[in-house]
Amino acid sequence: MNEIITARGSLLIAGVTIDGATVDIAVDEKGTIAAIGKDAKKTIDADIVIDGSDRIAVPGLVNTHTHAAMSLLRGYADDMILQDWLSQKIWPLEAHLTGDDVYAGTRFACLEMIKSGTVAFNDMYFFMDRAAAAVDDMGMRATLAYGFIDLGMEEKREAEIKATETLVAHVRSLDNPRIRVAVGPHSVYTVSPEGLRWCAEYAAEQEIGIHVHLSETEKEVVDCVARFGKRPAYLLDDCGCLTPRTVAAHCCWLDEAECRLLAERGVTASHNPASNMKLAVNRAMPYHWLKAAGANVSLGTDGCSSNNNLDLMEEMKFAALLQKFAWNSPTLLPAGEAIEMATAAGARALGTGPGTLTVGAPADIVLLDARAVCNTPLFHADSNAVYACNGGAVMTVLCQGRVLMHEREVPGEEEIVREAAAAARSLVDRAQDSS
């Protein structure tokens, strides 16, 4: 195994490129960036030295909407209408999930994210105690939420409340600064107003975040207005779910007033362009309205079953192109803003630091291959990162100063892939046997 990955202590990335300049990055033993510049090496006696020549340093990427264990469902069901896809394929299969499946799937998802430059993610799913174990093993950051779905039934709501409280207690017992917890009301169409209010009150009481799907489809909006007399964002607001700790995924069918409301409440909107296009939700997130209102807009992949990968490098390109095409504006969401969505905006949403390569920030650092075909010629690094490269250009990944991947080597990769493949096959077999 690569000894740079197994070593611990202070670290120096020597001769790396940042914004066109060749510098060193010094990382102290706490995993914090101690210095950046030509004299950075003088600030520490480095235990680990990484050769940064022919490498471009960028902040670690932050994926603000995932269902990580759904990596086991990659390619299981495609090219379907969203509600049919969920009700006929995804939900029936998920009924057979076990904690071991979620561990294997989440560990596999972490591997894929690391290999494409992601250091932190915002996850909503089930058996999240096992997801936490996978995140811990892989060395990433994550905010984990149990997917709260009560379907308007009081008995089910009580069970969801208990499951949420159990996860919060479990994550706090881990005392792991890389792993945080949130409340996860799935959506306005799967959670009753009573359930939404409980989620909001509990999140406020515990001082934790809220992770929710919002206005993904036109049907969600139409049904909400028909049932409650108001659009989904206003229903969430009435229930107390729109706060500065809230990440709202999708936001495709927001109107301009709802965009202003999210900005006023300090909500982060998570753009998931690949999933939205694949599921044909028929409208791109109104990024221009959200930005004009001052909202924080971040980037997510959604789950592997609707993307079908977790490559946030690729997602940046999808975001930029979709916005330009859908809103007929070639200047909308330029490359620099796409990178900011995938880094600093996501870090703000999850509270993982500034999401920048600056002194005092957590050493969440990605090194891209400057010699890769996608980076040749290298006129503008931001442009290449967004429009030309994908996760294959990622060579080295650090999270809080710990090397998770070096020269594309991740410890235990073959075993992780093998176990995920076996878990996926077993899950499908169990579902078929029961039908």
Set out the residue ranges of the language-model regions:
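Alpha-helical scaffold segments that flank or form the walls of functional sites
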Residues: 74-140, 163-174, 422-432
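Active-site microenvironment of metallo-dependent hydrolases
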Residues: 1-23, 27-34, 343-435
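Divalent metal-coordination and catalytic microenvironments
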Residues: 16, 31, 54, 65, ...
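Histidine/acidic-residue-rich catalytic or RNA/ligand-binding cores of hydrolases
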Residues: 218-230, 258-263, 280-290, 307-324, ...
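His/Asp/Glu-enriched, well-ordered alpha-helical/loop segment
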Residues: 238-245, 287-372, 386-390, 398
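Active-site gating loops and adjacent loop-to-helix segments of metal-dependent hydrolytic enzymes
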Residues: 72-104, 111, 138-153, 158, ...
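Metal-coordinating catalytic core of metallo-dependent amide/deamination hydrolases
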Residues: 130-252, 257-259
